[in-house]
């Protein structure tokens, strides 16, 4: 954080919480989750393969050897401790994969589709009707959109679930190059033009992200009660 935001980052606020406390809470939650996942893995007999163990050892060596002597002293850490930490994370990942391997995470290409649109937005029906008339008379979408949106066209990349439903339905029903009729959504009026009805590489990336979300939602649904049943005590002297 300091490398990106500077040393003053810890006095800033995140979601109404001091940054230092926010980061500690996030790390604490992550550590508790990993420890509980390792306990569950032990109960279920989940272990690392030889290949995984070798990869963990190699990664720990690489990480430790990249630390300066000053960093090693400041962290007060040994290579064995790094390898133990990496091993726990690898076991947690293995448990996660095992638990989520049997669920259906299929996402259709249409549900994952990412499109690019331009739109004209107006606060009144009369204004958007005026814009529609100009388009119907052959004026370019760019020219009309510029008058309603400032110096540049209003252009955006869209995924399902990000917009008002009426806007989304109209936008995703368009083919490349098509323009919608007047759409009312969220108390405003729009005319939408589709510049790409499928950004294929971004659609594939979004499909992967949606599948990962499904896995995480499922894992949380089955693991949170287990985690809540465990008593975890932090070493306050070390933690603070």
Describe the predicted segments one by one.
Residues 1-77:
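N-terminal targeting/tethering segments
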Residues 71-133, 146, 162-240:
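PPIase-associated folding chaperone regions across multiple families
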Residues 141-150:
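Short, well-ordered alpha-helical segments enriched in acidic and aromatic residues
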Residues 156-157:
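Short helix-loop boundary/capping segments
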């Amino acid at each position: 954080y300091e490398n990106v935001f500077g040393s003053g980052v810890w006095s800033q606020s995140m979601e109404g919480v001091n940054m230092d406390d926010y980061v500690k809470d996030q790390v604490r939650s992550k550590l508790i989750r990993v420890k509980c996942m390792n306990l569950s893995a032990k109960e279920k007999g989940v272990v690392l393969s030889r290949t995984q163990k070798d990869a963990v050892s190699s990664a720990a060596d690489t990480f430790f050897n990249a630390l300066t002597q000053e960093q090693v002293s400041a962290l007060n850490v040994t290579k064995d401790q790094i390898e133990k930490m990496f091993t726990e994370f690898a076991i947690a990942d293995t448990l996660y994969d095992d638990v989520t391997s049997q669920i259906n995470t299929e996402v259709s290409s249409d549900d994952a589709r990412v499109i690019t649109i331009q739109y004209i937005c107006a606060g009144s029906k009369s204004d958007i009707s005026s814009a529609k008339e100009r388009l119907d008379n052959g004026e370019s979408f760019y020219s009309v959109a510029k008058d309603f949106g400032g110096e540049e066209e209003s252009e955006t990349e869209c995924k399902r679930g990000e917009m008002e439903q009426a806007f989304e339905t109209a936008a995703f029903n368009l083919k490349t190059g098509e323009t919608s009729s007047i759409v009312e959504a969220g108390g405003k009026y729009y005319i939408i033009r589709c510049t790409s009805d499928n950004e294929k590489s971004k659609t594939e990336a979004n499909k992967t992200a949606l599948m990962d979300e499904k896995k995480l939602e499922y894992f949380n649904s089955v693991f949170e009660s287990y985690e809540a049943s465990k008593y975890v005590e932090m070493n306050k002297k070390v933690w603070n």
